[in-house]
Amino acid sequence: MSIPDSSVVKAFLLELQNNICNGLEALDGVASFKEDSWKREEGGGGQSRVLTGGKVFEQAGVNFSHVMGASMPASATAHRPELAGRNFEAMGVSLVIHPNNPHIPTTHANVRFFIAHKEGTDPIWWFGGGFDLTPYYPYLEDVVSWHQSAKALCEPFGDETYPKYKKWCDEYFWLPHRNETRGVGGLFFDDLNKQGFDKSFDFMQAVGNGFLTAYAPIVERRKETEYGEHERQFQLYRRGRYVEFNLVYDRGTLFGLQTGGRTESILMSMPPLVRWEYAYIPEAGSPEAALYSDYLKPRDWLSL
C-alpha cells in the first residue's frame, strides 16, 4: 500500500481552490473573490475566499483549511472510536454557491483528507467529499446533466462507484423533520482508503476537478432566465432548508465548530438572505409544486 503523503494533497487542494475561484469569476463576469487568510491557535489555518454582490452569484464561498490538533473531536470519534487518543491533521476545500437567479441551483462541494497519528502505530487516514445540487425550479435537463457528469468521473473507478456514492449522497442530504432531500443529490463519499493512498487520492481529485465541469453548463443555461418577485421569494423560502440542514445535521459543520475552527469560514455556507413561512403549501400544478412532488426525493435520474 502506498504511503499517505499529506503534502501532495495540500498542494492539490490549493490549486483546486484557485481553479474553482477563477472559473466562478469567469462565469460571473463582474465580481471577484476577496481572500481572508486566518490562523488557528491550536495549529494550522486556512484561506477563505468569498465573492459577494456579483451579476450571477449573490454569494459564493470557496474555503481551504488545514488544521491539526492533539486529539480528535467527538464528531469524528463517534463513528470511528479507534481515533480516540490520536493527534490529527485535516485539510480540505469546501464551497457553497448561492446564485441571484432562482432558476440557477445552489450548489455545494467538498473534498477533504484526514490523517491521525499515534506513536508506534500506523496512521489512520481517509478521504471524503462530494458535490450536490439544490435547485429551486425544476429543470430535468439540468439534473440529468449533473448526474451524467457525476457518473462520467466515476467510471474509471468501477461500475459500482457512481450508484454507491449517489445513494450515499441521497441518504446524507436528507432532512428527516421535513421528509425530503435537500436537493437532487450528486456524489458523497467518506472513509475512502481501502484501495490505497494513490487510488483514493485519484478519486478525490476527480471529484474536485469534476465539480465545475458539472455546474458551469447549468449556470450558462439559466443565468439569463427572467424571474420576478414570486420566484425570488420562493428561492428565499427554500434556502431555509439549507440553513436547517447545515446547522442541525451536517457533520462538517459540527466538526469545524467542535475543533475550534474559524466560525466565519464554517458558517460561510449560510445564504446571505433567507426566509421562513409558516405552513407553506405550493399552489397545485405550479413549478413550485413540481419541485416538491418530483424532485425532493431520491430518484434514478439517468433512467428517466
UniProtKB/Swiss-Prot annotation:
Database matches in InterPro entries = Coprogen_oxidase_aer, Coprogen_oxidase_aer_sf, Coprogen_oxidase_CS
Q: Catalyses which reaction?
A: coproporphyrinogen III + O2 + 2 H(+) = protoporphyrinogen IX + 2 CO2 + 2 H2O
Which top class of enzyme applies to this chain?
oxidoreductase
Localization annotation: Cytoplasm
Note the SS bond partners. Answer: none
Its job: Involved in the heme biosynthesis. Catalyzes the aerobic oxidative decarboxylation of propionate groups of rings A and B of coproporphyrinogen-III to yield the vinyl groups in protoporphyrinogen-IX.
Which named protein is this? Answer: Oxygen-dependent coproporphyrinogen-III oxidase
